[in-house]
């Protein structure tokens, strides 16, 4: 299988409708791949907090999903939209990831469960999601998490329990903590023997420089592809059996206990 990372810049002075058109053109002109992943909230701009209320959309037929579904159909390609500001009623918004199949239909959605509060308004403006799921694809059983979710092992244990073999991670991870990004994407791949496909944003949004370094990490922790810090689309080939072969050769997950109880010494 061939997987592409679309490391997109979202400058705050670029209108979302222009960015959607620009990115759709980039994807249509990109080399062939079976699956492409975009960053977190690339269309509205993650750091465009003052505009969130005006940039919410439907995950069924909103402008971002509609534009990416058209690309998916034209290229017969799976597209992970990254995430959009989903309107969920009553003026509420969620940070929702969307996976689109080659027929343009939605195959999986996930609303980010760990909204970020440190020097960010995400936790003030967005409602956290409450559920996560996985779906079967030609690439294996697939789940998605978003950005800050990387820091929470319990969520990753859950997607492992759901049978995930591939984890897609859209992000808007700042350059200041890009070392953590690289460490955590590798760690999650190794500890759960997953193929981790992680797409960060690029460029600057206001005063914040985004870290880039989108990457694909196999279950051994080998980095199959890593981008730099600028906007680009790049792809690599990944063996179809990389997860199954790793788990068969080194069956760590077979030794995982069903529970790890905390014991208190009462003596």
Predicted regions and their residues:
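Cys-nucleophile CN-hydrolase/nitrilase-fold catalytic domain and related Cys-dependent amidase chemistry
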Residues: 13-103, 109, 174-194
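Short beta->alpha transition motifs characteristic of CBS
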Residues: 49, 98, 109-116, 215, ...
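Short beta-strand scaffold segments in enzyme catalytic cores
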Residues: 81-83, 96-99, 133, 214-216, ...
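Active-site catalytic loop in hydrolytic enzyme cores
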Residues: 88-162, 175-177, 183, 245-252
